[in-house]
Amino acid sequence: MKSLFKLIGLVFKGIWKAITFVRLALTNLIFLLSIALVYFIYFYGHDTQPQVEQPSALVLNLSGPIVEQSLYINPMDSFAGSLFGEEIPKENVLFDVVDTIRYAKDDEKITGLVLSLRDMPETNLTKLRYIAKALNEFKASGKPIYAVGAFYNQSQYYLASYADKIYLAPDGGVMLKGYSAFNLYYKTLLEKLDVTTHVFRVGTYKSAIEPFVRDDMSPAAKESATRWLTQLWGAFVDDVANNRKIDPKTLNPSMEEFLSQLKSVNGDLAALSIKLGLVDELATRQQLRAQLAEKFGASGDDSYKAISYYDYRATMRDNFDVNADDIAIVVASGTIMDGQQPRGTVGGDTVAGLLRQARNDDKVKAVVLRVDSPGGSAFASEVIRNEVQALKDSGKPIVVSMSSLAASGGYWISMSADKIIAQPTTLTGSIGIFSVITTFEKGFNKLGIYTDGVGTSPFSGEGISTGLSKGASQAFQMGIEHGYQRFISLVGDNRDLSLDAVDKVAQGRVWTGYDALQHGLVDQIGDFDDAVAEAAKMAQLENYNLYWVEEPLSPTEQFIQEFMKQVKISMGVDIQSILPPSLQPVAQQMEQHASLLQNFNDPKGYYAFCLNCEVQ
């Protein structure tokens, strides 16, 4: 009997081993098949390499925002977003757009450019001007540019104005709304919710905290914003009027003049666009395709020979000289925050590390720091500025290229460079500092919630449920005043200005690049190309490569990112994308204000940030 049980046990043991073997084998087989499937999709599952027919038009069909640096999309967020049907939004890196236009200018297969910009959102004028520079270079080569559109928003029309001919749909129009700076204000709301806002600041024009303590824009903030908005709009109008050979007044009518003009064409925006000289011809899609087919040759799909911007980029070859030295490009784009941060945010430790990497690289002979930031953490700004100073002390030239925005903390990280180059429409300055602390003791008490206890120091009981004592408030204000004095002292030392001279142009006031030059805050008016040329000149370089220093992705992250692009996995849901377009600007502004209170992470809570520098 014992032998029988032993035999039965051996049989069951053998069966269990067999089941385990089959289970593991199937699991491993599924895993290997998954790897093989991913490999096949990644390397063979996408379309063949795009080809450029000769001759062809390059269609600049930009979809999505123009950015300084592309973001890394977290794969887990992407997978979660796919459940909601959200697609990956395209991002167009400014320098890629310009490089592509310049590459096409010298490509014999490309005989013209078609601007099809209906999916390009409103974009800052400084970035548009850099693209426009490349469009002018393309035209100078003798190749034509045509703009096509059913309806042009302001940014789309700005680029379209550089075309040789602008087409508009018969039921379309051109809407030029000008520039503005409007904010939401929450003082009364916070009072109704019994939220106490403690504000500490230095600077008459430091208006970042106004939404929390006022119900309207202060006169000082209105004065400052009116000045730089007028300059930006004037630059827009002058550029377009010059391109279209029309009177600038045409682009800046009063409401009465606009209504009178619209009435003269029975409310037809397309007819008004023709009458004012904003466009050249009204054409349906069929008429447009026929005309472009005559210019570039007909294709088999009742259209014209063309290749899209995204397909064309895949055909471009890098022009890289392995024997040449490098000029390193470090991008600081976004709000400045402490520590390591992903792309889209300027991490103090992240950007400082990239600058240090460039400083220690013997092949790098000069550095261009590209700044597009409204500022943020004062502590993180100083971490980056210290590394800029270390680069300068090492003997390697460092030039700052200011993009659309280099204000407050964005100016802080720039001021120690060997040379600062801004465009006329750059917004910079905003030299000031503040702190905001919200406490809820009144609201809690109304709800019947109270805080009580003991502590070992006068600061032990300070918190969101107890409020701030008079002494704590005084300590915060003294710290802010010290931070402001340090800020303007650094500006004075680095810009060779007296403290009085700095204080007169500081106080949180925003300046355009043109005004900043007059006040000694920048050295030169120019764009990114000028900054690179200046860095090369200072380093005595004739031949060089541009080396974009970025936080490296791991091999796994690189693979996942490229794989996601191929299989079109979608990204995480953005609440703004769910809202109607008319509500998205309001949601964006509320999100920005909330992040000011919740997400900023300066160790001391001191911020050099420009909230009112967003142009609408």
Listing of model-derived features with the role each one plays in the protein:
Residues 1-22:
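N-terminal Lys/Arg-rich, disordered targeting/topogenic segments
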Residues 2, 80, 322-327, 331-363, ...:
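Intrinsic disorder and flexible/low-complexity segments
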Residues 23-42:
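Hydrophobic membrane-insertion alpha-helices, especially the h-region
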Residues 38-46, 97-99, 313-315:
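Short alpha-helical segments and helix-capping/turn motifs at coil-helix boundaries
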Residues 49-51, 56-183, 319-443:
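Cleft-lining beta-strand/loop regions that shape enzyme active-site pockets
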Residues 183, 187-291, 441-535, 539, ...:
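Charged, glycine-interspersed solvent-exposed loop segments at helix/strand-loop junctions
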Residues 267, 288-329, 384, 561:
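Extracytoplasmic and endomembrane cell-envelope/extracellular-matrix remodeling and assembly machinery
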Residues 530-562:
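C-terminal intrinsically disordered, low-complexity extensions immediately downstream
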